[in-house]
Amino acid sequence: MLTAKFDQLVKQLRILPGVGQKSAQRMALHLLTKKRPQGMALAQALDEAMRDIVECQRCHSFSDDAVCPLCQDPRRDDALLCVVETAADVMAIEQTAGYRGRYFVLGGHLSPIDGISADDLNIEQLVWRVKQEPVEELILATGTTVEGQTTAHFINEAVSRHVNKVTRLAQGVPMGGELEYLDSMTLGQAMQNRSFL
C-alpha cells in the first residue's frame, strides 16, 4: 500500500493467528512510527527463535537445547506422563501449577479428513518411550473434539499393553459455569463423569 517493503511486512504479520489485513497494517504503522527500537528487538528475537528453538528429543515440546528444562528437571514425577497435542497444551497445563509429571507432545491429532494419520504424529515414539521407560499412569490430555477423542482412543489401544493405568482428563462443567448455558454434549459428559465429594 505505502511501499513494497511495508506491504511485505503487513503480509508477514498476517500469518499470525487472528491477525487480518487491518490489524497487520496497524501493527506495521505502530512499529514504524512509534516503536522502531522495539521493532528491531522484535525482529532480532524472532530471528533467534526461528534459528535456535528446536524440538525436545524426549517430549517433543520446544527447547533451546536438545532436551527441554521440563525433561531435565529432577523434581518432576517420572511415574506420570501427560500426552498432549501441542506445546501450547504443555504451557496451559503448566500455568495451572497443579501437575508435576512429565509430558509428551504428539504434534497434533488424528484427522483423516485433513490427511493426518498416526504416521504424521509422534505416536510411535510414545509407544517406544512407555516400553523403555515404564510409567504408572499415562494421562491423555487431548482435546474434546472428535479428532481429540479419536486420538485418545487410538493411543489407548496402542499403549494399553505397556501401561497399567491410562486416564483421560475429566470433561464437563467449567468453573463458574451456569448449567442453563451449557451445550447438551458438555452437560451430558459432566453427568457421566460426575465425582464423589
Curated annotation (Swiss-Prot):
UniProt domain Toprim: residue ranges: 79-174
GO molecular function terms attached to this record: DNA binding; zinc ion binding
Looking up PANTHER family in the UniProt record yields: RECOMBINATION PROTEIN RECR (PTHR30446:SF0)
Q: Which UniProt keywords apply?
A: DNA damage, DNA recombination, DNA repair, Metal-binding, Zinc, Zinc-finger
Give the C4-type zinc finger regions: 56-71
Q: Which GO terms describe its biological process?
A: DNA recombination; DNA repair
UniProt xrefs under PROSITE patterns? RECR, TOPRIM
InterPro entries documented for this protein: DNA_Rcmb_RecR, Rcmb_RecR, Rcmb_RecR_Znf, TOPRIM_dom, TOPRIM_RecR
What is stated as this protein's family in its record?
A: Belongs to the RecR family.
Q: Give the protein's function.
A: May play a role in DNA repair. It seems to be involved in an RecBC-independent recombinational process of DNA repair. It may act with RecF and RecO.
NCBIfam families assigned? recR
Organism lineage? Bacteria, Pseudomonadati, Pseudomonadota, Gammaproteobacteria, Moraxellales
Superkingdom, natural source:
Bacteria
Instruction: Supply the SUPFAM superfamilies for this chain.
Output: Recombination protein RecR (SSF111304)
Q: What is this protein called?
A: Recombination protein RecR
Q: Which Pfam families match?
A: RecR_C (PF21175), RecR_HhH (PF21176), RecR_ZnF (PF02132), Toprim_4 (PF13662)
